[in-house]
């Protein structure tokens, strides 16, 4: 059987190409059947001694004379990405988890039977080799193969090497193929792992204990969001996938664990957008005897170090614009940000709830009769105007501080500004990256705020919070002054990897069903 041509291996985009792919798959199934009959279809007795990346790192500058004088024996395996058959000698480019390396395969070295079989192996097959390192006449570090085996037969052809997966949705839906053919995708997810590892080190060095709290909650809480609902059969009770771990983490502060953090999934039954995925990763941390000012300094340093560890520099480029994370982050109030980016608004207008309600309705076409606006006060209206006029302009790292109490039901109130809380949100490239505040530890104040949230929910606001009586009971045992913050890991990784869509940094994002 002949080797599939590059055109045959392309991603099918027409009926004709689909037929070609089906033909290729049928041919490969015939090859697999022959391997089964020989009893060698999927061997599992090969142990590699090296990876491609490590070989290039260690021997990338070693010349041929040195390799001949001190032979380097290697056993290596990977996916065959390129293949050139030339009479009695052939080349194959093999890719493992660390990179690519070239195999040099000759009939004299591997034997006539193996060499004949190799000619019928396909791109995408997993193969292994034992041999010695050498340099080709062109100077490329390669493996002079002595033993060659087929470990796993690929039945489906890879996309064309020059075009890869052209359709973005296919990249998300078939991430396994995207990872095979796209070095950029592999780099993105390695950077994600490095960023999370950096965060864990940073937290451990600061004395934080990593914990795990429930994913199934009897009462959803810790954020203003619509939950996913499920049913616990054994307990015969309705449960909610967690929207945030906040209230459980603060219970641990009450219990005496004074510095805790968790990196885990949250679930919110809401829309999908370039910034939102219903299942996403958050890091939340809480520290006793701190406040929101301490949190801002700590978060700034943590993000800066994550950039250095994941990308090698505190300076990153996002969508063609450079960001220097080594500089101090800006700080603005909500009204200060509005007047910076929409200077036409006066102090008097920003203090006039009737004006703001009319402005949001008439200029920004917002339905101010919606349930979440029924009892909206000045603070809520200011926040919505900020979101419409300023949020997208916050490209440089900027803390927006001093949020209204009515939109911050879990945050401690300011000692000097009535109606304001000690809360911040961090924006970078116009996106919220973090949200933190000095925690409200007054159980009576917290209970009253929960009651107001219940009123909002009863009025039709699906994102308003429930009343959590057990959390109030925990606060009644006494919680020390505490600061807490949540950081969106996915959005942070978007920033560090120059990814425009949150689905670019989630291995298997949610998509509509295939027809």
UniProtKB/Swiss-Prot annotation:
It comes from the Bacteria. It catalyses: tRNA(Lys) + L-lysine + ATP = L-lysyl-tRNA(Lys) + AMP + diphosphate. PROSITE patterns: AA_TRNA_LIGASE_II (PS50862). Mg(2+) 1 binds at residues 425, 432. The keyword Magnesium applies. GO terms for cellular component: cytosol. CDD domains: LysRS_core, LysRS_N. Its EC number is 6.1.1.6. It is an enzyme of class 6 (ligase). Pfam families: tRNA-synt_2 (PF00152), tRNA_anti-codon (PF01336). It is found in: Cytoplasm. Its main location: cytoplasm. Its cofactor is Mg(2+). GO terms for biological process: lysyl-tRNA aminoacylation. Keywords: Aminoacyl-tRNA synthetase, ATP-binding, Cytoplasm, Ligase, Magnesium, Metal-binding, Nucleotide-binding, Protein biosynthesis. Binds 3 Mg(2+) ions per subunit. Belongs to the class-II aminoacyl-tRNA synthetase family. Homodimer. This is Lysine--tRNA ligase. It comes from Cupriavidus metallidurans (strain ATCC 43123 / DSM 2839 / NBRC 102507 / CH34) (Ralstonia metallidurans). The lineage of its organism: Bacteria, Pseudomonadati, Pseudomonadota, Betaproteobacteria, Burkholderiales. The gene is lysS.
């Amino acid at each position: 059987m002949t080797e599939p041509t590059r055109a045959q291996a392309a991603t099918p985009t027409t009926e004709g190409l689909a037929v070609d792919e089906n033909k290729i798959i049928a041919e490969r199934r015939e090859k697999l059947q022959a391997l089964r009959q020989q009893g060698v279809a999927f061997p599992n007795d090969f142990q590699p001694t090296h990876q491609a990346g490590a070989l290039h790192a260690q021997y990338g500058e070693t010349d041929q004379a040195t390799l001949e004088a001190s032979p380097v024996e290697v056993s290596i395996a990977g996916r065959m990405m390129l293949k050139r058959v030339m009479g009695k000698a052939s080349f194959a480019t093999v890719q493992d988890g660390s990179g690519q390396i070239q195999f040099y395969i000759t009939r004299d070295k591997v034997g006539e039977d193996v060499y004949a079989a190799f000619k019928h192996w396909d791109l995408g097959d997993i193969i292994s080799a034992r041999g010695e390192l050498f340099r080709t006449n062109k100077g490329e570090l390669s493996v002079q193969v002595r033993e060659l085996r087929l470990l796993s037969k690929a039945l489906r052809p890879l996309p064309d090497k020059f075009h890869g997966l052209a359709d973005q949705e296919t990249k998300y839906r078939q991430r396994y193929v995207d990872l095979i053919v796209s070095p950029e995708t592999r780099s993105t997810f390695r950077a994600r792992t490095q960023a999370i590892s950096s965060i864990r080190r940073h937290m451990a060095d600061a004395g934080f204990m990593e914990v795990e709290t429930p994913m199934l909650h009897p009462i959803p809480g810790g954020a203003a969001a619509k939950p996913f609902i499920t049913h616990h059969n054994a307990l015969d009770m309705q449960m909610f996938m967690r929207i945030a771990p906040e209230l459980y983490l603060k219970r641990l502060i009450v219990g005496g664990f004074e510095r805790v953090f968790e990196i885990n999934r949250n679930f919110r039954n809401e829309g999908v957008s370039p910034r939102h995925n219903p299942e996403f990763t958050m890091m939340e941390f809480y520290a006793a005897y701190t406040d929101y000012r301490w949190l801002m300094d700590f978060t700034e340093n943590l993000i800066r170090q994550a950039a250095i560890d994941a990308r090698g520099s505190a300076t990153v480029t996002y969508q063609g614009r450079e960001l220097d994370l080594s500089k101090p982050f800006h700080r603005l109030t909500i009204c200060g940000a509005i007047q910076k980016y929409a200077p036409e608004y006066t102090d008097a207008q920003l203090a006039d709830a009737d004006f703001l309600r009319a402005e949001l309705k008439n200029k920004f076409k917002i339905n101010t009769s919606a349930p979440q606006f029924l009892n909206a006060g000045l603070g809520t209206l200011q926040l919505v105007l900020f979101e419409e006029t300023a949020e997208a302009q916050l490209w440089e790292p900027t803390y927006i501080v001093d949020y209204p109490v009515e939109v911050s039901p879990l945050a401690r109130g300011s000692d000097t500004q009535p109606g304001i809380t000690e809360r911040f949100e961090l924006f970078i490239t116009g996106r919220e990256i973090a949200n933190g505040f000095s925690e409200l530890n007054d159980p009576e104040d917290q209970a009253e705020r929960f009651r107001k949230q219940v009123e909002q929910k009863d009025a039709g606001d699906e994102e308003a919070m429930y009343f959590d009586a057990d959390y109030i009971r925990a606060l009644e045992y006494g919680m020390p002054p505490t600061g807490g913050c949540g950081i969106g890991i996915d959005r942070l990784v978007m920033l560090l990897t120059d990814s425009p869509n949150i689905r670019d940094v989630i291995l298997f994002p949610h998509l509509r069903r295939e027809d």
